[in-house]
Amino acid sequence: MSPRSCLRSLRLLVFAVFSAAASNWLYLAKLSSVGSISEEETCEKLKGLIQRQVQMCKRNLEVMDSVRHGAQLAIEECQYQFRNRRWNCSTLDSLPVFGKVVTQGTREAAFVYAISSAGVAFAVTRACSSGDLEKCGCDRTVHGVSPQGFQWSGCSDNIAYGVAFSQSFVDVRERSKGASSSRALMNLHNNEAGRKAILTHMRVECKCHGVSGSCEVKTCWRAVPPFRQVGHALKEKFDGATEVEPRRVGSSRALVPRNAQFKPHTDEDLVYLEPSPDFCEQDMRSGVLGTRGRTCNKTSKAIDGCELLCCGRGFHTAHVELAERCGCRFHWCCFVKCRQCQRLVEMHTCR
């Protein structure tokens, strides 16, 4: 192997290690709880954290269970959004939790980084509003009377604190060594796009006060959207993600569309550096599990249909008996009694 080839291989290895380590903190989702953390030494034992995240853990012990919850939210939402796709956001019990898929600069990695940073921002924000954290509470900057005439009151979600903590904790790996590399730029951009998906969908919730249900006085507060809405928004961004490449702009490096005919991406869009594999066949070297054995929809022409999901390999059909409740009746007072029925259904799985 030539010296140039050796150098290129070394760079690819460093790139893979860097990219994997950046998302290893998601392993916190595998823990049942980190709420029992009471000593700083425990932070050293949390699997998947880099040293600067360990230091943040020691300074913010009470927040770490919210970080764990945010990681769980991210994984669950990813699996929901991609449940009918060839890549269905499967996780492993090892590092990184999404396998080697996230070490590549693909659309899938872009979504994982975006939904993960959003998960932490969301969970920490909700913990603030619930009074679970001493360092933060409701957003007291929202007060007075709005231009629409209602009174700002109640507990507005402190999204500023949640976003700031997500930036400090999630972005720390990219903002250290190699922060100007193309993959670091991609990760940082998608992390921020995830947080903006919450910010742009913040809601105003209100309550009426008055005699007999009238609305003489209306008090309102700002609230984060349901996380499912954040997931839907980021899935749309995934479908319209922009392929980019690094380019020097002035004295710094930036990501620009690879195709000059495409419009420049915004801060809310997802970006990726390389095309995705087709995810059809198992390839453990690249972290692809394949679609063999996956359940498919025989009548669908979309990606969840047997033709596309099974990549043209065909599918098996089996008749399966399912047990379900039927003939339910309400009995006074107060319970519902049902019979157990068997139903025969057709199941289709990819060859």
Swiss-Prot record:
Keyword Manganese recorded: no
List of glycosylated residues: 88, 297
Species, as recorded: Rattus norvegicus
Record's comment on post-translational modification: Palmitoleoylation is required for efficient binding to frizzled receptors. Depalmitoleoylation leads to Wnt signaling pathway inhibition.
Family designation: Belongs to the Wnt family.
Signal peptide: 1-22
Quaternary data: Interacts with PORCN. Interacts with PKD1.
InterPro entries the record matches: Wnt, Wnt4, Wnt_C, Wnt_CS
Domain of life per record: Eukaryota
Protein name: Protein Wnt-4
GO cellular component terms, semicolon-separated: cell surface; cytoplasm; extracellular matrix; extracellular space
Any one Gene Ontology molecular-function term assigned to this protein's record: receptor ligand activity
GO biological process: adrenal gland development; apoptotic signaling pathway; branching involved in ureteric bud morphogenesis; branching morphogenesis of an epithelial tube; canonical Wnt signaling pathway; cell differentiation; cell fate commitment; cellular response to estradiol stimulus
Pfam family name, one: wnt
Lipidated positions per record (O-palmitoleoyl serine): 212
UniProt xrefs under SMART domains: WNT1
Role this protein plays: Ligand for members of the frizzled family of seven transmembrane receptors. Plays an important role in the embryonic development of the urogenital tract and the lung. Required for normal mesenchyme to epithelium transition during embryonic kidney development. Required for the formation of early epithelial renal vesicles during kidney development. Required for normal formation of the Mullerian duct in females, and normal levels of oocytes in the ovaries. Required for normal down-regulation of 3 beta-hydroxysteroid dehydrogenase in the ovary.
Subcellular location: Secreted, Extracellular space, Extracellular matrix
Keywords: Developmental protein, Disulfide bond, Extracellular matrix, Glycoprotein, Lipoprotein, Secreted, Signal, Wnt signaling pathway
Cysteine pairs bridged by disulfides in the record: 78-89, 128-136, 138-155, 206-220, 208-215, 280-311, 296-306, 310-350, 326-341, 328-338, 333-334
